[in-house]
């Protein structure tokens, strides 16, 4: 067992954190009041009881809170504020390197709005980081500077009502097959990330694919990942969180993922549905060997996994993180959503260490 005091004392990274799942409850309430957004409660304890619970029955209940957080993050002022507060909160937990991810298309009505959203988040992160980095402690060498980057997300799937951007796309292309629509949207998300980087200097370091995994394969977004690769944007994919090893395989083989978000069902050969993989155990072992050998990093978020994956039974003893480490894989422990999961990086590392 690693002492909690040691975990808290050392500088840490957090490279899998969703902005819209990691805001302060007090800020959510304040922004909702100012923007006339309906909440089920305007009290912190009320929201903890009704929405942001200690435990969730399923993924659907876990995701419910995002309808409220996204609703208050539709303008630059709110995005900048929430990004800055996330840096402040992370600094208090000892984080000194952070990658913040979000899907601009969820918070915008047009491509240009997406660029502005990325810039607003970048401005908020930069301002908060600068306050720390110009402090006396950092200047004297008693503390490390805070470094950060942004990961731009696209969604595996979307439907009408999710955002103004998606509604506009559905209106403009009403007869197009849905898989082609999501492919167009993710490709445009990469182009937005490149534009924000090249026009405004926004440090977009990576591209990610999030959202409903089952039924919406990563391969539908091949063009987006090719575009990201062409523009030197690193590639990660949420995979193996709600589907089996073949989802992780597709993320690596089709999208050239350098990192995998969650990967919880990496070793679950019994969840393979593709009949092309006749020997499921052999395929799973070969995939695990490749991930370990090629240093494809697995971004593990313990609390989030325990809250959304019933098969784990709420027990880290059932989580594959120990097996991943024993396999020689590169594993990065992260928070996922500090608000929704009621967590911080120290708690996540402690859970992983005790698994």
Residue ranges of each PLM-predicted region?
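Metal-cofactor-binding active-site regions of metalloenzymes
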Residues: 1-233, 241-259, 265-355
């Amino acid at each position: 067992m690693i002492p909690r005091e040691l975990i808290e004392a050392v500088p840490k990274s957090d490279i899998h954190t969703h902005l819209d799942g990691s805001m302060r409850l007090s800020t959510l309430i304040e922004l909702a009041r100012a923007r006339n957004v309906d909440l089920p409660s305007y009290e912190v304890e009320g929201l903890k009881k009704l929405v942001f619970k200690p435990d969730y029955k399923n993924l659907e209940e876990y995701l419910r809170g995002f309808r409220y957080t996204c609703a208050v993050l539709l303008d630059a002022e709110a995005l900048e504020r929430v990004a800055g507060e996330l840096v402040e909160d992370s600094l208090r937990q000892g984080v000194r390197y952070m990658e913040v991810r979000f899907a601009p298309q969820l918070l915008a009505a047009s491509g240009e709005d997406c660029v502005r959203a990325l810039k607003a988040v970048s401005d908020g992160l930069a301002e908060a980081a600068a306050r720390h980095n110009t402090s006396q402690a950092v200047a004297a060498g008693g503390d490390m500077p805070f470094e950060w980057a942004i990961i731009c997300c696209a969604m595996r799937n979307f439907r009408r009502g999710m955002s103004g951007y998606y509604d506009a796309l559905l209106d403009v292309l009403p007869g197009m097959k849905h898989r082609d629509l999501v492919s167009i949207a993710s490709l445009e998300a990469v182009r937005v990330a490149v534009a924000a980087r090249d026009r405004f200097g926004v440090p977009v370091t990576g591209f990610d694919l999030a959202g409903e995994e089952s039924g919406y394969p990563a391969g539908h977004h091949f063009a987006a990942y090719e575009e990201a690769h062409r523009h030197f944007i690193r590639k990660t994919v949420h995979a193996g969180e709600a589907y089996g090893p073949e989802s992780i395989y597709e993320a690596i083989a089709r999208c050239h993922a350098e990192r995998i978000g969650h990967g919880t069902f990496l070793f679950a050969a019994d969840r393979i549905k593709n009949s092309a993989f006749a020997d499921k155990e052999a395929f799973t072992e070969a995939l695990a060997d490749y991930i370990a050998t090629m240093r494809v990093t697995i971004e593990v978020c313990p609390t989030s996994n325990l809250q959304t994956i019933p098969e784990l039974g709420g027990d880290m003893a059932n989580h594959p993180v120990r097996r991943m480490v024993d396999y020689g894989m590169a594993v990065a422990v992260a928070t996922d959503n500090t608000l929704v999961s009621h967590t911080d990086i120290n708690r996540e590392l402690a859970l992983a260490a005790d698994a």
